[in-house]
Amino acid sequence: MNLHEYQGKQLFAEYGLPVSTGFAVDTPEAAAEACDKIGGNEWVVKAQVHAGGRGKSGGVKLVRSKEDAKAFAQQWLGKRLVTYQTDANGQPVTKILVESCTDIAKELYLGAVVDRSSRRIVFMASTEGGVDIEKIAHDTPEKILKATIDPLVGAQPFQGRELAFQLGLEGKQVAQFAKIFVGLAKLFKDHDLALLEVNPLVIKADGDLHCLDAKINIDANAMYRQPKLKTFHDPSQDDPREAHAAKFELNYVALEGNIGCMVNGAGLAMGTMDIVNLHGGKPANFLDVGGGATKERVTEAFKIILSDSNVAAVLVNIFGGIVRCDMIAEGIIGAVKEVGVKIPVVVRLEGNNAELGAKVLAESGLNIIAATSLTDAAQQVVKAAEGK
């Protein structure tokens, strides 16, 4: 689950980290009032969406009057912001963050992720702040500094000081960086985060360090342990198909291809997507119906897949283990009839009662293409999607 910038900064403040004074507002009038509360004569207004690249798309602006802040809120509230990290429809803007202006001398980067290879939280820092860190890691990986956190003892101040020296920080900045480093590490662990970024972490004109941005992603599997963070969820930022799928305990992720995929098991689903790609196709989604693939869930899965107008064919790949393939076949037939599927459907069944399942499909009288193997299924669905 992603958090908005203002929510991330709220958590930063709770851990004693330096952030700008700001208010998240949902009306133009409140934006003007926020300027009065903050004081001064310059403010930064930011559209709140779960995507980067807001500045380049006009979603971040420096304003010098309450009227300009109000006008910015009027411009964006209720609209959709399109950035390089969103699809063509963009993300809806329901909140504007109004905060004090910061005089920046230099921009740095500080972030943390769970590194699967070392099974540790790893912090990354760079002197190249304010830009896409993935690009820096690709073009100049030597500019990425790393510190691995030992789970038994946690983040240590000396690790923060080492990074600070490598970043070229001096004097009071070293202690400030170490405090931010340890605070972020505690925040990461306490709230089961999957990713945390401060981009940029800035050196102000007076030499102090300041967290100018906050990007936080929480491990969805740990949300049951984070009741407070559940209240931070903004459903307006969710893909409507993914949100609908979650109601039926279907794991769905929308992609940009034209071949719908329905599979039981996350690993098999990823393998199915890979083999579709291998044979020249483009998956329209990841969809794992899980072990209990009932007719109702298969029906909902079809509805979700077909709600994507780009889908030209559907591949159903089921491995029968606890669930029998003949039961799955009956569910597919019922779903195809109920939903009224008009595009080609390729089905590959393997495992428990696979032959009986194939027979049920063949006798259904429906235009369902039975595949003999996963390779055959991928080839068939790619041809079907191309109209061949």
From Swiss-Prot:
Q: Which reaction does it catalyse?
A: succinate + ATP + CoA = succinyl-CoA + ADP + phosphate; GTP + succinate + CoA = succinyl-CoA + GDP + phosphate
Q: Name one Pfam family in it.
A: Ligase_CoA
Q: Name one GO cellular component term.
A: succinate-CoA ligase complex
The ATP-grasp domain covers which part of the protein? 9-244
Instruction: Cite the PROSITE patterns for this sequence.
Output: ATP_GRASP, SUCCINYL_COA_LIG_3
For the protein in the UniProt heading, the enzyme class is: ligase
User: What EC designation does it have?
Assistant: 6.2.1.5
Describe, as the record does, how this protein assembles with itself and its partners: Heterotetramer of two alpha and two beta subunits.
Instruction: Quote the function comment for this protein.
Output: Succinyl-CoA synthetase functions in the citric acid cycle (TCA), coupling the hydrolysis of succinyl-CoA to the synthesis of either ATP or GTP and thus represents the only step of substrate-level phosphorylation in the TCA. The beta subunit provides nucleotide specificity of the enzyme and binds the substrate succinate, while the binding sites for coenzyme A and phosphate are found in the alpha subunit.
Per its record, how is this protein called by name?
Succinate--CoA ligase [ADP-forming] subunit beta
Organism per entry: Pseudomonas fluorescens (strain Pf0-1)
